[in-house]
């Protein structure tokens, strides 16, 4: 049950953070492309580190 609340809080914080960043960075039109590319690169690096180890089912499918 504690893990459920932790995951829920993490999802809600992610929505809050994405709304906050998109609102702040879109105030000036000059930085929109640069800010978007930095955000995408950061998110991709986080995802690469998080999903470095493949789940068992994907490993089984790839060996077929």
Swiss-Prot record:
Cell location: Plastid, Chloroplast
Organism: Guillardia theta
Record-stated family: Belongs to the ycf20 family.
GO cellular component: chloroplast
Chief localization: plastid
Lineage: Eukaryota, Cryptophyceae, Pyrenomonadales, Geminigeraceae, Guillardia
Name of encoding gene: ycf20
Keywords attached to this entry: Chloroplast, Plastid
Protein's name according to its UniProt entry: Uncharacterized protein ycf20
InterPro entries: Uncharacterised_Ycf20
